[in-house]
C-alpha cells in the first residue's frame, strides 16, 4: 500500500483556522494553537449570546413601552393589565415599534387600556 502523506490536509486545516481567527488580537490571530483555542471560546460565546439576545431585546422593548406609557400618566404594569382586560393582544415588540414610530396610535391603545382598568387599584380583577 502507498504511504499517505497528510501535509496538504494539515496545511489546509491550519489555514482555515487562521483565516477564521483573522480578526482577533495578538497571537490569537497568528499562532495556530492560540487561534484554535480562541475559536472554541468564540463558538461558545456565540451560542450563549444568541440565546441572551432574545432577553436583551425583550428588556429594550419593555423600557421603550414603559417610557411611552409614563408620558401618558400610567405605569407599565397597569398598562399591560389594561391591555389584557381590554382584550388587546399585541406583543411587546409591536407595542414598542408603535410607541416609537406612531405616537398617536399608541395613545389610542393606552386610552383603551386605561378604560379597561378598574377605578380602584385594589379591586379584584375579573379576567
Swiss-Prot record:
Has keyword Calcium?
A: no
* PROSITE patterns given in the database record: RIBOSOMAL_L20 (PS00937)
Q: A Gene Ontology MF term for this entry?
A: structural constituent of ribosome
Q: Supply one GO CC term from the record.
A: ribosome
Which Pfam families does its entry note? Answer: Ribosomal_L20
Query: Which HAMAP family does this entry report, sorted A to Z?
Result: Ribosomal_bL20 (MF_00382)
Give the family from UniProt. Answer: Belongs to the bacterial ribosomal protein bL20 family.
Specify the protein name.
Answer: Large ribosomal subunit protein bL20
Originating species: Bifidobacterium longum (strain DJO10A)
